[in-house]
């Protein structure tokens, strides 16, 4: 189950840059604890799915997991051994830009110790530094 949009207005996009802190999505909205990004990064749908599977295995079907990011930016790539020019390449993967301070995953309905361990394992699957946050702690 990869996280890609069903329909987009434009098929390809510019690369862009990730500047500044996140404007929204920096606090917990659903669960009692979560995983917050500390560095800017482009997360792929495969990385998000890998982290989600890691959390699900750690929790053993107890509690609930919310994914707070969605991949909506296409990344194009030209094939190997193709010369420059002749248009932009085809879509290789989908990514989302993550700014520092953004909550990536939330967990509810489990103990704090189990949630911390599950999110620690999930953060190992992600290409950036993350921190554990709780409802009372910021």
UniProtKB/Swiss-Prot annotation:
CDD domains: Ribosomal_L16_L10e. Keywords: Ribonucleoprotein, Ribosomal protein, RNA-binding, rRNA-binding, tRNA-binding. GO terms for molecular function: rRNA binding; structural constituent of ribosome; tRNA binding. GO terms for cellular component: cytosolic large ribosomal subunit. Transmembrane segments: none annotated. It comes from the Bacteria. One of its GO terms (biological process) is translation. Binds 23S rRNA and is also seen to make contacts with the A and possibly P site tRNAs. Part of the 50S ribosomal subunit. Belongs to the universal ribosomal protein uL16 family. PANTHER family: 50S/60S RIBOSOMAL PROTEIN L16, LARGE RIBOSOMAL SUBUNIT PROTEIN UL16M. This is Large ribosomal subunit protein uL16.
């Amino acid at each position: 189950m990869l996280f890609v949009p069903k329909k987009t207005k434009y098929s390809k996009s510019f690369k862009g840059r990730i500047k500044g802190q996140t404007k929204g999505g920096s606090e917990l909205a659903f669960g009692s604890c979560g995983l917050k990004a500390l560095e800017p990064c482009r997360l792929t749908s495969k990385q998000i799915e890998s982290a989600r599977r890691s959390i699900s295995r750690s929790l053993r079907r107890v509690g609930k997991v919310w994914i707070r990011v969605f991949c909506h930016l296409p990344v194009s790539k030209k094939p190997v051994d193709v010369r420059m020019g002749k248009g932009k390449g085809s879509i290789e993967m989908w990514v989302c830009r993550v700014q520092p301070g953004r909550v990536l995953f939330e967990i509810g309905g489990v103990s704090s110790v189990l949630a911390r361990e599950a999110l620690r394992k999930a953060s190992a699957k992600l290409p950036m530094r993350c921190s554990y946050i709780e409802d009372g702690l910021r």
